[in-house]
Amino acid sequence: MAGIPPPTRNPEIKHNKIFINNQFVNSTSNKAYPVYNPCDNEKVCEVQEGDKSDIDKAVQACKAAFKRGTPWRRMDASRLGHLLYRLADLMERDIAYMASLETMDTGKPYKNSYQDMVHCIQVLRYFAGWADKNMGESIPVDGDFFCYTRNEPVGVCGLLIPYNYPMLMMTWKMAPALACGNCMIVKPAEQTPLTALYCASLIKEAGFPPGVVNVVPGFGKICGQYISSHQEINKVSFTGSTEVGMLVMQDAGKSNLKRCSMQLSGKCPLVVFEDTELDFAVQQAHEAAFQNMGQCRWSGSRTYVHENIYDEFVKRAVEKATSRKTGDPYEMDTEHGPQIDEEQYKKIMEFIKKGKDKGAQLKCGGNRHGDKGFYVEPTVFSDVTDEMKFSQEEIFGPVQLIMKFKDMDEVIDRCNNTDYGMAAAIFTNDINRSITFTHAMYCGTVWVNTYNHWFPQAPFGGYKKSGLYREMGKYTLQEYTEVKNIVYRIPQKNS
């Protein structure tokens, strides 16, 4: 792939300890847990396993850094932005290493890991520009008063990161949190802690003061739950399943009513009308379903195709799926890697079995690929109905469900008939049809004649059980600030 430096196979593991107060340290218990390569299920290394006592230490480090009068609290906003720019530059310097490390940790193709890192750098630079622009305002109130607002940092934030985009999701949360002046504990997914720990070393190198960013690897049921329920953490940002997100919100409410932002599950529809360019729509729907091995909250797993082109679409979709290059993620032409672990592999295979049992037609795939790792063949089903369980629940795997529809009103109702509302897409050359569809969709993002494009400048998030609030763009700054109103009585107001 042009412009991408070659990967490093089996990159050196430079950091496997907990990062607190700008130091890599052993966990309090001195326990470690294994991290595996999902391509072959071979152990990569052992990482120090954080527990509640390590979270407490990280919280105290955050509180010390956030104390009034500290270098972090007194730092000029322009200087804070400079540190974020510096962190982006360091990531750019080490981009090939970080992409290689992420590929080993997740199994995703190296070229995709590389693009993830490019996007991380863009996000850091975007929010670096916001550091000295997230300002309050003066308000012209009645009477002899001077009224204005301040946008102040929330304080100590807990960032709970998923395994599907480890560095990308960390950056989506960390960059705006830092731009607003917060301190944070990052808890990466237990399966994929390595790039987060390496990023911690770059945070120190960039010049962020001790305690501002702390990274504690560990298990969700221990560290994640404790962050959600911790009395001294002011905000939690979580990306993961709706089921776990509800537990996070319960813990947040029962503890100190901490603020929550949630990016949760999805079951996104992609609608193809008969007037579109068919090969292009097939390609876009293919990538929507299989990108990142289907391990995306915004995966376009429900493909609705107009009845006039349905059979031909299915035929071409099967051709695309069967030709998708599956295998070694370090090869530049590989498009499809393994699922993250055995648990997820088994869940996907069970969904496939249930789909066949309910009468959906398996057109290709549906089996394990190879005899090592957790590879699932790109899988296509036709003759799927909305009532089937795998049409309603998030599979989080490489399974494309192709359904037939007759007209606009019908497909709008079917698209919206779900518990989720992450994203949707329409492929059509009719501008009036596209406007009707985009306005009717009950979801956070609608793509027209494209799929899976998001930008640092634009908000991303879901309706309904797909989440709360937005990440990226100016909208996410609200999630990491408190608005304070200040009112002075003055001798005389003048215009």
Swiss-Prot record:
Lens. CDD domains: ALDH_F1AB_F2_RALDH1. The keyword Transmembrane does not apply. The keyword Transferase does not apply. The lineage of its organism: Eukaryota, Metazoa, Spiralia, Lophotrochozoa, Mollusca. Keywords: Eye lens protein. This is Omega-crystallin. InterPro entries: Ald_DH/histidinol_DH, Ald_DH_C, Ald_DH_N, Aldehyde_DH_dom. Gene3D superfamilies: Aldehyde Dehydrogenase, Chain A, domain 1, Aldehyde Dehydrogenase, Chain A, domain 2. Omega-crystallins are structural components of squids and octopi eye lens. Contains relatively little if any DHAL activity. Transmembrane segments: none annotated. GO terms for molecular function: oxidoreductase activity, acting on the aldehyde or oxo group of donors, NAD or NADP as acceptor; structural constituent of eye lens. Belongs to the aldehyde dehydrogenase family. Coiled coil: none annotated.
